[in-house]
């Protein structure tokens, strides 16, 4: 009985399992047929069956995948005013700036997203800029020394700390440099071993001329009092020709736009914070000369341009705001002889309102071992007064009674007028000898070993050129 019951139970249990398998198979076949019918019904969107089906089952909810829109870069062309302080206005005609080549966006600056066509020689063909492109630099963003501007009437009573970059005016020459030709491929290395430099052998320092000079009455320097002056490798003497102040008749012609002495007269006083600035130079050593000579760079010792100069003594690349510029340099006549002689009796300090990226590299080329110029100060060491850079000599940390500054812009030493010696701006004159004219006077100041300010004031009389109250 038990065996039969077990067999019967096994047979009974087998039947429903078989039915279940058949049911599952039929169900899968039905699903397959339904899916096939669904596919066919989806193909034909019209008909009574599709209508009934949609009515019974309902419309399937389509889940749309939220995919972000395809990114596209804004075609914002490059601004050509990368070294000038005056941005191009929107109403000016657009033009290409073929002498710039980009390396990549810096500090969030936008660049064109389109691939720039490459010429067969490997140079980039820069597209014409649009007037709506935003300016990438401020009005003070030049690599060369900017031109001074008058104080606005609303800010005449402002202090020296109230600087306004909007009042800085760029030099006309720098603005002209926007019309640049195609930039030649130049290495981006900043080494000073001469591989990036191009020297003109015809422009080597010439020997000093032997000039018979006469001593004017009333000078503190006489030929008999002067020691023999010979530059290294030269047997010629410097002439003792005093620099003459500009004549009143031609003064207005030279300064049609800007009067440096009117600027000096109305310059605001230094703030307490500026007066207590930490000295930028290290303390003197035993080998340091007792007297300090501060020299300007642009138009005082050299003349630099972004336009190609055929008579350039050297040329070198400068990377400024992601753009490589080729700088062409002219050296003022007797530039090296002057430095070689003065460095023996003065602590030579270069103080320029130019950008460090340009001035420091130029000095590395001209004086790589710092044998002539002991210290270098740049724009960041100047005092910015309403957009104008003034060289406050207090930042040197030196005794001002034994400090002399030579600059082609008298307003640059507006706060220490009695320490300043003006010199004529130099651009191209090969017969210039203004540096030679200053040598006897500078040597005499060291020989006297007294306060230099009364002698400078008596010799150049810059205070007499200030406008009356």
Curated annotation (Swiss-Prot):
Its EC number is 3.1.3.-. PROSITE patterns: FCP1. The keyword Ribosomal protein does not apply. GO terms for molecular function: phosphoprotein phosphatase activity. Residues 28-42 have a biased composition (Basic and acidic residues). The keyword Membrane does not apply. Residues 286-445 form the FCP1 homology domain. SMART domains: CPDc. Keywords: Hydrolase, Protein phosphatase. Probable phosphatase. This is CTD small phosphatase-like protein 2-A. It comes from Danio rerio (Zebrafish). The lineage of its organism: Eukaryota, Metazoa, Chordata, Craniata, Vertebrata.
């Amino acid at each position: 009985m038990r065996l039969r019951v077990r067999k019967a139970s096994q047979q009974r249990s087998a039947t429903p399992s078989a039915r279940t398998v058949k049911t599952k198979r039929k169900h899968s076949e039905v699903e397959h047929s339904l899916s096939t019918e669904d596919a066919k019904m989806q193909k034909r969107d019209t008909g009574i069956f599709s209508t009934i089906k949609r009515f019974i089952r309902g419309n399937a909810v389509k889940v749309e995948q939220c995919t972000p829109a395809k990114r596209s870069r804004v075609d914002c062309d490059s601004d050509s005013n990368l070294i000038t302080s005056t941005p191009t206005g929107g109403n000016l005609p657009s033009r290409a700036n073929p002498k710039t080549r980009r390396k990549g966006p810096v500090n969030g600056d936008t660049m064109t997203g389109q691939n720039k066509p490459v010429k067969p020689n490997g140079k980039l063909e820069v597209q014409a800029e649009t007037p709506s492109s935003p300016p990438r630099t401020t009005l003070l963003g030049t690599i060369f020394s900017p031109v001074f501007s008058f104080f606005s009437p609303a800010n005449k009573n402002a202090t020296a700390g109230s600087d306004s970059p909007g009042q800085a005016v760029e030099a006309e020459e720098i603005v002209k440099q926007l019309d640049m030709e195609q930039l030649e491929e130049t290495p981006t290395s900043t080494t000073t071993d001469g591989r990036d430099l191009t020297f003109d052998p015809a422009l080597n320092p010439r020997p000093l001329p032997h000039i018979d000079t006469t001593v004017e009455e009333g000078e503190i320097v006489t030929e008999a009092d002067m020691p023999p002056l010979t530059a290294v490798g030269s047997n010629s003497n410097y002439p003792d020709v005093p620099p003459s102040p500009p004549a009143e008749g031609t003064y207005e012609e030279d300064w049609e736009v800007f009067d440096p002495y009117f600027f000096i007269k109305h310059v605001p006083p230094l703030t307490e914070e500026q007066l207590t600035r930490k000295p930028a130079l290290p303390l003197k050593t035993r080998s340091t000369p007792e007297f300090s000579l501060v020299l300007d760079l642009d138009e005082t010792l050299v003349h630099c341009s972004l336009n190609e100069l055929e008579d350039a003594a050297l040329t070198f690349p400068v990377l400024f705001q992601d753009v490589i510029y080729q700088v062409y340099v002219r050296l003022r006549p007797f530039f090296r002889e002057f430095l070689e002689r003065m460095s023996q009796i003065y602590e030579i300090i270069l103080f320029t309102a130019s950008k460090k990226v340009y001035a420091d590299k130029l000095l590395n080329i001209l004086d790589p071992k710092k044998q002539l110029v002991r210290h270098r100060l740049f724009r960041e060491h100047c005092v910015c007064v309403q957009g104008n850079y003034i060289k406050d000599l207090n930042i040197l940390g030196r005794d001002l009674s034994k400090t002399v500054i030579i600059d082609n812009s008298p307003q640059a030493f507006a706060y220490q007028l009695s320490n300043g010696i003006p010199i004529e701006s130099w651009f191209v004159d090969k017969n210039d000898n203004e540096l030679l004219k200053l040598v006897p006077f500078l040597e005499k100041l060291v020989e006297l070993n007294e306060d230099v300010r009364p002698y400078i004031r008596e010799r150049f009389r810059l205070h007499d050129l200030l406008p009356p109250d």
